[in-house]
């Protein structure tokens, strides 16, 4: 790392792999971006011992980060670290640059003091691309149970890789579908395929345990003692009570 020179080493059945504490581990426990100490060689020139370095720190679950490209700085939480010319950034087997990192990524970071040695994207992102959005513009899409976004014309959205149920609804039209977001790829969805038969309504039963509470949907007070029929889509909900 200090010289910037790259070397290629080989390992075999007799090679021992160890964590930084000296405990045995498998070769599968070594990942892109790890820093290791390599010692000895057998008669075939293969390494005898490969051990994770105890001279570096690691953070395998970085999500709160930002990159200051102008100053070559990686911010993790409230701490700043230097990005150098020899800092390696990986996504799977690919070497990437800081422009490819987004806030949706989860990183494994290795450093020495305040210098970043390597960054590996452990959970990457892909792109969701919507088409024929006009019927749903101004309403919200839902991806899984954590991602909500207002729909705009033919929008695209960076999304962490994984499997999701995509749901859309507006003015009584809508539906859902299962999608797969793959790292570095674009998943295209035509919202015309999700509008379904409409306009549709859904019955909502409100559970209220505050005496005298009032509920308003789209500015109108409702009787919540029985299920209320509401069209699919975006609505405003207001609850008031004395005190």
Predicted feature residues:
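Short, solvent-exposed S/T- and G/P-enriched segments that are highly enriched in secreted/extracellular
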Residues: 23, 94-96, 146-158, 219-230
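Short, flexible, surface-exposed loop segments at domain boundaries
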Residues: 1-10, 20-82, 93-143, 158-206, ...
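Solvent-exposed strand-loop boundary residues in beta-sheet-rich modules
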Residues: 3, 145-147, 172-174, 219-221, ...
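LysM (lysin motif) carbohydrate-binding repeats in extracellular/periplasmic proteins that recognize
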Residues: 79-91, 220-221
């Amino acid at each position: 790392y200090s010289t910037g020179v790259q070397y290629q080493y080989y390992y075999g059945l007799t090679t021992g792999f160890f964590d930084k504490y000296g405990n045995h581990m498998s070769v599968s426990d070594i990942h892109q971006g790890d820093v290791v100490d390599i010692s000895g060689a057998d008669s075939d020139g293969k390494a005898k011992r490969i051990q994770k370095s105890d001279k570096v720190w690691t953070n395998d679950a970085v999500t709160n980060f930002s990159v200051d490209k102008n100053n070559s700085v990686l911010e993790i939480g409230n701490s700043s670290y230097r990005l150098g010319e020899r800092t390696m950034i990986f996504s799977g087997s690919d070497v990437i640059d800081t422009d490819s990192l987004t806030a949706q990524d989860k990183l494994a970071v290795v450093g020495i003091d305040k210098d970043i040695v390597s960054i590996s994207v452990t959970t990457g992102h892909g792109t969701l691309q919507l088409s024929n959005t006009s019927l749903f513009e101004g309403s919200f899409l839902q991806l899984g149970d954590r991602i909500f976004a207002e729909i705009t014309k033919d929008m695209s959205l960076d999304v962490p890789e994984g499997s999701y149920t995509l749901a859309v609804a507006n003015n009584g039209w809508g539906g859902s579908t299962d999608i797969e977001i793959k790292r570095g790829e674009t998943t295209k969805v035509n919202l015309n395929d999700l509008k379904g038969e409409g306009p549709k309504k859904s019955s909502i039963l409100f559970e209220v345990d505050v005496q005298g509470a009032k509920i308003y949907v789209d500015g109108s007070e409702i009787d919540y003692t029985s299920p209320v029929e509401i069209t699919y889509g975006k609505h405003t909900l207001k609850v008031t009570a004395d005190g």
